[in-house]
Amino acid sequence: MKMKSRKYFWESLWEGILKLSGSVTSIAIILIIIFLFSEGFSLFSSKKIEDGYSILVNKNNKIEDVSSSEIKKVFDMEIVSWKELGVDNNEDEITVFRIDNIETYATEEEMILIEEDVANVGKVISRILEDNSGMIAQVPKDMINKDFTQKEIDLGHFSIREFFTLKEWFPTALPVPQLGVMPIIMGTLWVSLGAILLALPFGLAASIYMAELSNSKVYRFMKPIIELLSGIPSVVYGFFGLIVIVPMIQKIFNLPVGESGLAGSIVLAIMALPTIITISEDALRSVPRAMKEASLALGANKWQTILKVSIPYSISGITAAVVLGIGRAIGETMAVLMVTGNAAVMPKTLLEPLRTIPATIAAELGEAPAGGAHYQALFVLGGILFIMTLLINLFVEYISSKNKYKTK
């Protein structure tokens, strides 16, 4: 009786420990997801203008609606007249004013007033804007006081539409960060698609050979090598790509630089091969022997049996292997960062440098001020990556469940 009660006690204890650890893990994952999306969504309630600054114009200026990209072009002197911004009744050219060059526009008396009391800056800036009807100014918000009589432009908040449709990623731009993630999303999809197109034929061929054609000696040699490939750190693949693949691409295609989307796709294809080969091989080995023998008995040869029986029967498992390979490619960071050129521009071909979501987060998160628009935008990118990988995993679960139902 004592033995039974003791055994029951230890079983209950271990069961409780397992339940507790599972609960803690689940709660931690949920909290991480909540933190990720709460930090990300806070971007869309943030002002576009850099924190602590204001954009000012003459009080008679009719400008009302201006985008963040237009403001950047104004301060970069790419837009030089108010007509280009839709202010039809304003013939003035745009003059850019920053607080650093206040001495250029202020009189000696005004500079003395500022030196005596910094609170006089608002009055001086008002006078400068009054005398220069075409001026646009970026000044610290705390300099706008009761003496300021001109107009402040309200740029509004970051919008979801602009975030996903703009094609410029320049989060450190002043006075307004440029947070268009379209180039980064497209770079991620291009590299991942290229990787799967390269990895699928080689991975499927290797899995067919190992499952259907190889003898036991060759199989015992190949299996550990493939498993070893999956255990190599991604930075090692990155070094291999940087030393071997990048110079090769530069030489073959006569490019100014070899860091490109194609280099990233080749490296990711090599990294995805172990996943595709292993899962596809397991799926091919699950084909009932009776089906193969029936095919051979009807006069089909070995290759006809593989193409007409084995592959169609195991297509769900092969599809799951491909999708998991895509998931590996989408989430990879270091290897891609090393070989793609890390350029946040819209890719036109795989021979151009580009940037992916994981590489962007890894390269910029350490430099982004906590709580700023740049920091929050990186969390939005993390949320996008999470949703992409979640959808991939759900699709794999769906395919796997279909395969299990079919085998029953």
Regions found by a protein language model. Give the residues of each.
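Periplasmic/extracellular loop-to-transmembrane helix junction in inner-membrane transport proteins
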Residues: 2-16, 41-51, 67-70, 78-81, ...
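Membrane-interfacial helix termini and adjacent extracytoplasmic/periplasmic loops
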Residues: 11, 39-44, 159-179, 237-271, ...
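Cytoplasmic-entry segments and transmembrane alpha-helices of multi-pass inner-membrane transporters
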Residues: 14-16, 202-241, 408
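Flexible loop/hinge segments at secondary-structure junctions
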Residues: 47-165
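Transmembrane alpha-helices
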Residues: 279, 288, 302-338
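C-terminal transmembrane helix and the adjacent membrane-cytosol boundary/short C-terminal tail
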Residues: 281, 285, 289, 296, ...
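Interhelical loop and adjacent transmembrane-helix boundary motif
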Residues: 337-386
